[in-house]
Every structure is written in C-alpha cells, then in structure tokens.
C-alpha cells in the first residue's frame, strides 16, 4: 500500500525511541521513553541491566506511540528493532534470561579463562597480537560467566545478542540479522556465518548449539506474536524485519553507501565507519562488520568513551553551567558549546588523548591531557576534549584509508554531538573535509526504516531508497588555514606523543596493578 509506514524501535543506552517513517524518510509520529536508571553496578566499572527492561520500555513507548494516533499506527506495514552492540543474554531452555545483561561498557575481566591452544598462542605472538587477544579473551562476557558462574553457564541454552532476545520477545523466534551480531562471539564477519574453525574461534569458545539462527538483513524474522501484540499494541502477525545494529543502521541512515564517504558517530562512544564492498580489517585481527546491505561491510574504528567524555567533564568541572542550564531550560552542553568560539583552534596548546577506556586493538592506551599552562581554563579543556576525539577519529580514518586504498572526500555526522553547529565546524576544519548533516537527528532509526522499505519492495536498492529518503540539511566547509594548523598538530605532535607515551602507560598500569 502506498501509504504504508515502517515502525522502528531504536533501543539505546539511555532511552528507547519509537518512530513511524513514511517512504520519503519523514517521521510521521515518534515517542521516547528515557530510562530512570540505564544500568546498575554491583562493583566498580561493572554495568548490568535486566534483558526484559528493554522489552518493557519497548512496550511503553509502543503504546505511547499508538495512543498518539491509532490511525497512523495501523498503517505500519512492518516493525524493526535496532539495538546497541556488544551486549548479550543467557537464555534458559524456557526462553527466559538466566541472569542480567553485562552491558557493552562493563569493564570486568575473567581472571583465569579457559587457556588458549598453544599453537594459536604461538600464531598470535608471531603476529604481535598477544596483548590484544589476551584482552579480548579476558573481557568477553561469556568467559567471565563460564569462570565465575559455571553452573549458570551450563544451564544456558542460548547465548544471544540483546537484539536477538528482543526479536524473540516479539516473534518467538531466536534469530537475528547478520548485520546485528556485533559482540564477543565466534562470528565470521566476512562470510556472515558462525565461525567453526577460524583462528580466533578459541577466544570465544561458545558451543555451536548455544548460538542463534542467522538471517540475511531485510529478512522476515516472524510475525508479532499474540502475547507481544497484547503488550505492545502492535497488530499480531505484523512482519518483523531483521535490519542491523545501531551503528550500521546509522551509517546507512546518514546516506554513507559510497567508498568516498565516511560516517562519524558522535554518541556515547565515537566511531568512524566506511561502507565498502571489499572486506578488509580496519586494524589487524579486528573485523569489518557486515553492513545492512548484504553485500557490503562497515570497517570501523571506535573510541569507547566518546562523547561520554563531555558528560564526564560536565560532572567534574561544569557545575555552574549545569545549574545555569536548569534555570534557562537548556542543556549544559549548549552553554559550554557557546564558549567553543572563545578558544582558538588547538586550544592554546592543550592536547587530549581521549582513551579514558582502552580499545580492544590498543589495550595499553590511556587518557591524557598535556600542555597545561596557568592561562588555560575549563573551556580550553572542553574544546581540547572535542579536538582530541577528532584527532583519534582522524587517526582511525587515515589508517583505514591506507589499508583499503580508499580516499574519503565527504563526512556525514550523526549522534548527539552532531547537534552542535560549533562541533560540526570544528570537525570540518580538523579533517579538512566537508561535513554534512541530514534532515533528522534520528539517523539510526532512519537507517532501519530504509532497510524496511527495501525489504517491503518500495525500492529496488539501497541507493534508490537513500535517494528518496535522505536529504542533506546543511554542510560545513572547512577553513583551510585552521586545517593546516590541525594537520600539523596531528602529524607533528599527536601521532608522535601517542606512540611515545603508550609504553609508559603500559608500565604505569603494571606498576599500579602490582601495588594493589
């Protein structure tokens, strides 16, 4: 039907949003439910939440959306859910969770995971990847559970991604899109199937029968069950479509489909993603993720603590702005962003390495602020954090360009940080590339809607769907002089400092761990 809508749930770290999109990319209706407590911590650096917490919020926001306009809600021809990554669920034989989710930001480690085979350890050492593999091995939730909750692990019938579990709650089928399975699990990202004998299979030694069914992106997972219909208000039998992860959907939603484009996501974590038909590892042993289009990939570099760092800064250094924002009815970030123009490019020599949490491929990195003098203010720190995040993303983008032979000529921004004109302009100046925003900040949900309408047959290809559903709202042109300055800082200082200080960070970590 020509007036059909796509119902999309965007399940985030902080909230769930429900949206109805038309085939022109317009949001016809939307509703949001913000979590009062996104997660709880039983120990420092732990983060957990009930799996059904997210389904319950889907139910709340779905009913809220239906109440806005039952007529529009009834026009939904499909439903799709896109979810944050690297969060898994232990399901019992009855389909119920056996424990709460260990969320993606959780930093616990297995102390004595199952030893890796000697021949594999030798190969990892030969490739110079011992520390990265050890970090992957120890930080995998499955290995922590197997070590610390062995009886529960034995009882686990299925070990699935959160997205898979939500599919199950809606349809009764334990299946997921090949573009949603981004977690520490034995997945062959290149071939979109479970890895049975690959080199890194031993790192996540999960029995094959504990894993879910894999579907091509755009497939029908199943019809909404009568029970899910009762709880959500979604008509029973409405087809649920397999789409992709939040970052993968966001990249498509930002219209990044060509090999001269890159998507920058300025969310809780920051990423730079390409879309490419050729598979290549963005860094050694780190896979390119399957893209929402089934014949494409999304190589990515991620800064785990991305725009979360602005929250960290706000909590520790910007109480005055927080109080002022309450009085003005705006966010503290809006007030802080107005001061960005008061600080020159390069933050008067203050430089940030934004690795408050080390990445999987860089286990010895740590965060740092260098270059302090007595005239620096908190506003210098704020701008330096934004610049530091961009330097790290630039470093990741340049590395992927070298490994792929691609040349990026245009950037597309999504995530909360992209709402700021000042941040967008700084980004254009630093990368020396035009930076564009699309018609909506809901690029993740839009990407899931694009996948939905391709699956429903409204469009013959993703390129066709993007042409009809995505519009450029504004573009920021780089300032050539500022780019020259940033390029010098990156090449002459940032890269050299990063390489020089990483061994010291490793030593410092070893010393302080021993002291504990």
PLM regions and their residue ranges:
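A polyampholytic, Gly/Pro-enriched intrinsically disordered region
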Residues: 52-54, 118-133, 233-234, 260-263, ...
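Glycine/Thr-rich phosphate-binding loops that ligate phosphate moieties of nucleotide
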Residues: 1-34, 77-118, 151, 218-221, ...
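N-terminal phosphate-binding loop and adjacent alpha-helix
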Residues: 32-74
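ATP-dependent carbohydrate kinase catalytic cores
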Residues: 189-294, 327-338, 410, 418-428
């Amino acid at each position: 039907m020509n007036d059909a809508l796509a119902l999309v749930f965007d399940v985030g770290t902080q909230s769930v949003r429900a949206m109805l999109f038309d085939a022109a990319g317009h949001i016809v209706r939307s509703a949001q439910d913000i979590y009062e407590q996104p997660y709880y911590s039983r120990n420092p650096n732990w983060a957990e939440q009930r799996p059904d917490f997210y389904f319950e919020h889907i139910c709340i926001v779905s009913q809220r959306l239906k109440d806005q306009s039952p007529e529009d809600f009834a026009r939904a021809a499909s439903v799709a859910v896109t979810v944050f990554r690297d969060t898994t669920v232990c399901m019992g034989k009855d389909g119920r969770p056996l424990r709460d989710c260990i969320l993606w930001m959780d930093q616990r480690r297995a102390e004595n995971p199952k030893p890796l085979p000697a021949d594999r350890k030798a190969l990892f050492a030969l490739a110079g990847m011992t520390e990265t593999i050890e970090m992957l091995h120890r930080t995998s939730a499955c290995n922590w559970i197997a070590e610390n909750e062995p009886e529960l692990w034995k009882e686990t019938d299925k070990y699935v991604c959160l997205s898979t579990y939500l599919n199950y709650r809606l349809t009764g089928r334990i299946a997921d899109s090949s573009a949603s399975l981004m977690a520490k699990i034995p997945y062959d990202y290149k071939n979109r199937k479970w890895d049975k004998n690959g080199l890194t299979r031993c790192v996540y030694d999960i029995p094959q029968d504990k894993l879910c069914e894999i579907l091509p992106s755009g497939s029908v997972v199943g019809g909404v069950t009568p029970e899910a219909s009762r709880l959500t208000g979604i008509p029973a039998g409405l087809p649920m479509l397999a789409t992709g992860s939040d970052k993968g959907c966001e990249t498509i939603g930002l219209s990044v489909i060509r090999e001269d484009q890159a998507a920058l996501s300025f969310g809780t974590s920051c990423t730079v993603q390409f879309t490419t038909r050729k598979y290549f590892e963005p860094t050694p042993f780190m896979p390119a993720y399957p893209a929402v289009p089934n014949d494409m990939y999304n190589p990515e570099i991620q800064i785990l603590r991305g725009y979360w760092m602005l929250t960290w800064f706000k909590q520790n250094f910007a109480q005055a702005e927080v109080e002022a924002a309450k009085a003005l009815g705006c966010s503290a970030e809006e007030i802080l962003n107005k001061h960005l123009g008061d600080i020159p490019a390069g933050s008067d020599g203050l430089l940030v390495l934004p690795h408050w949490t080390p990445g999987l491929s860089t286990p010895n990195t740590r965060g740092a602020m260098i270059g302090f003098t007595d005239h620096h203010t908190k506003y210098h720190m704020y701008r330096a954090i934004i610049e530091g995040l961009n330097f790290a993303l630039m470093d990741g983008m340049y590395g992927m360009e070298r490994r792929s032979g691609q040349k990026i000529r245009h950037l597309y921004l999504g995530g909360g940080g992209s709402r700021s004109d000042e941040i967008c302009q700084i980004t254009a100046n630093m990368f020396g590339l035009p930076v564009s925003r699309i018609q909506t900040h809901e690029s993740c949900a839009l990407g899931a809607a694009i996948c939905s309408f391709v699956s429903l047959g409204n469009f013959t290809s993703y390129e066709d769907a993007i042409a009809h559903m995505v519009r450029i709202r504004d573009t920021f042109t780089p300032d050539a002089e500022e780019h020259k300055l940033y390029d010098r800082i990156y090449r002459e200082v940032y890269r050299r400092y990063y390489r020089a200080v990483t061994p010291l960070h490793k030593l410092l970590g070893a010393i302080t761990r021993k002291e504990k």
